[in-house]
Amino acid sequence: MEKFAAISCIHAPVHNESSKKWLLDHLEGTKLDHFVLLGDLFDASAASVHPDTASHSLLDEYESASQYLKDIRSVLPKKCKLVWVLGNHDDNIQANDERRIPGDLRKLVHWNSCQEFSQEFLRWKQIPYIKSKAGCHQ
C-alpha cells in the first residue's frame, strides 16, 4: 500500500514558522510515496487587485515558497513523488486580469520563469487550478 501526505495553504511568505517546523519534524523519516500540496503555496498579495496591500514583493513570495518546498523535499525519501495542485491564490498570479499583472508581463513573472527559484518549482508536478463557472462560494 502506498503512503501519502497532503497539506494546503502555505501562503508564502506569511506562513507560520512553528507550523513549518512541526511539519518537517513529522515528515522526517517517513516512508512516503507521495506528497501533495493542495493549493495556495503563494499568498499572492503582491499580485492583488487591492492596491498597496502587499507588505512584500512577488519575488519575496517566490523565494519563500521555493525554500519551503525545498525544505519539505529535503526530509522526504528521494523516490517520493511531489505534486502541487495549484489553488486560487497561486492562480491569481497568472489570472487574466489586467488589475493584477498586465498580460504582456504575465509569462515573464511566472514562477517557472524566475531563474533564481524555478529549479525547485519544476521538481514538483504542477496541476492547474480550474475555476468553477459557478464560483467558489456556490
Where are these regions (language model features)?
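Core catalytic region of metal-dependent phosphoesterases/phosphodiesterases
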Residues: 7, 12-121
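Hydrophobic, aromatic-enriched interface-forming segments
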Residues: 111-138
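Active-site-proximal beta-strand elements of phosphoester/diester hydrolases
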Residues: 2-12, 134-138
